[in-house]
A protein has these predicted regions:
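Hydrophobic alpha-helical transmembrane segments
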Residues: 43, 312-323
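Membrane-interface micro-motifs in multi-pass membrane enzymes
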Residues: 33-41, 92-95, 148-162, 200, ...
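Transmembrane signal-anchor hairpin modules in multi-pass inner-membrane enzymes, especially those
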Residues: 1-92, 101-102, 108-121, 169-179, ...
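Membrane helix-loop boundary segments at the extracytoplasmic
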Residues: 27-37, 308-311, 344-384
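Long extracytoplasmic/lumenal interhelical loops at the membrane interface
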Residues: 247-262, 270, 274-311
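A membrane-periplasm/extracellular boundary helix in multi-pass inner-membrane enzymes
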Residues: 136, 191, 195, 213-254, ...
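Juxtamembrane membrane-water interface segments that cap and precede transmembrane helices
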Residues: 23-25, 139-148, 294-305
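Alpha-helical transmembrane segments of multi-pass inner-membrane proteins
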Residues: 45, 74-79, 101-105, 114-142, ...
């Protein structure tokens, strides 16, 4: 290859790499404000990344321990599509599979600890601004729960995970100024989360913080229930009522969920292997709803119940396997991380995933595009941390082998 051609190729590759990184910053900055901007920026990042592969004529893809799980899950989606009761609708919902690319575009293009930290800072700044807006909207109109675009569940899921991320940074960060800023972000997002009045997200945060405390310092575990008790004593009566009925099966929203899950079980029994397809379940729900029900639901407010109904036993097995593989990856990454930057990212990823799983027992948060995008972004950040850990270990081995 001629020298001029090499220079041109190198310049193009650097430009595409810069576009990829810039698009990733836009992705996280837009995450709490606009799913359209978020996914457009993500698409730009993916296209620029693929273009780099074409220019370099090699695969710029970081392998993970998740490939088999992803393949099985995608296969379950496609099998369910073939046997769906509403194939056109199932085709539309295949778009959720595209979000998985987030794991690889982030994991393969974040090439330094500084970039990891800057992406985390960008995310927390955006989420803190969003949370301050949410608190302000509540002050103006306290009769309305804080909402994100159209529902409080999305706001709850986003602020729940942002609070976890901020708390992780505060726990692992060595610089006092940054630690205080992270703590402020955790408080802002935590207050906004509380004002969404979404109990499933509250519980997800509480469990995640207990896990985080146990990983950082077991003595901190007692802090979480103490904070919860103090918060309970300080809140107005209507919030106390919702907390006190957390596990009351007769409480209105709890009773609704139990009814929805029972109806989901009836649908599953008639479609046990491949489910009804990844669709809006409103139409088929009407055929199975009991005489006491007045409204059909388009999803089942539980990730595993919804997957069982829509993808059947095959899909439920594949989805559960994927969740387990992700958890194992996050645990291994946390154990391997050495530097403060890598430890805060892996702690945020692991505890954020725990919060997502717990919240997903009460909401279809995997089907929420905003929350799912955030989930895959966090997993991608941990993949990048794993890559950086391997590189640092390799460099360390070289230093040991080469005499000084």
């Amino acid at each position: 290859m001629r020298e001029g051609s090499i220079d041109t190729t190198g310049s193009l590759d650097r430009t595409l790499a810069a576009i990829t990184r810039g698009a990733l910053y836009v992705t996280v900055a837009a995450m709490p404000f606009s799913i359209a901007v978020t996914q457009t920026a993500l698409a730009v990042a993916v296209l620029a990344w693929l273009s780099r592969m074409a220019v370099q004529r090699r695969l710029l893809l970081q392998r993970t321990s998740l490939e088999l799980a992803f393949v099985l899950y995608v296969a379950a989606e496609l099998v369910a599509l073939v046997f769906s009761v509403n194939v056109p609708n199932a085709v539309v919902y295949l778009k959720r599979l595209l979000l998985i690319a987030t794991v690889y575009v982030v994991g393969s293009n974040v090439e330094s600890e500084r970039t990891l930290q800057r992406l985390m800072a960008t995310f927390l700044l955006a989420m803190s601004l969003y949370s301050l807006w949410g608190v302000g909207s509540f002050v103006v109109n306290p009769s309305v729960r804080v909402r994100h675009i159209q529902n409080s569940m999305t706001a709850g899921g986003l602020t729940m995970m942002a609070t976890v991320v901020a708390a992780a940074v505060a726990c692992e960060q060595k610089e006092t100024r940054v630690r205080l800023l992270a703590l402020a972000a955790a408080i802002a997002n935590g207050v906004c989360l509380f004002l969404t009045n979404t109990r499933g997200s509250w519980l997800g945060l509480a469990v995640a913080l207990v896990v985080m405390a146990s990983l950082v310092d077991w003595r901190l575990v007692v802090v979480v229930p103490v904070l919860a008790i103090l918060a309970y004593l300080a809140v107005p009566g209507e919030y106390k009522a919702r907390v006190s009925h957390f596990f009351d099966p007769h409480y209105r929203t709890n009773a609704y969920r139990i009814t929805w899950w029972k109806t989901g079980w009836r649908i599953f029994k008639d479609h046990p292997v491949t489910g009804v397809g990844d669709i809006d379940t409103g139409a088929i729900y009407r055929k199975y709803m009991g005489p006491e029900e007045t409204q059909a639901v388009g999803h089942f407010h539980n990730n595993f119940v919804h997957i069982a109904v829509t993808l059947g036993a095959l899909g439920l097995a594949a989805f559960t396997f994927l969740m387990v593989r992700i958890l194992l990856l996050l645990v291994a990454a946390r154990r391997a991380a050495r530097s403060p930057a890598l430890r805060e990212v892996t702690l945020a990823g692991l505890c954020g995933f725990v919060a997502f799983l717990v919240n997903g027992l009460f909401e279809w948060n995997y089907g929420d595009a905003e929350v799912a995008t955030l989930l895959w972004w966090l997993v991608g950040m941990v993949v990048a941390a794993v890559v950086l850990t391997r590189r640092s270990l390799a460099v360390g081995a070289m230093v040991v082998e080469v005499p000084g």
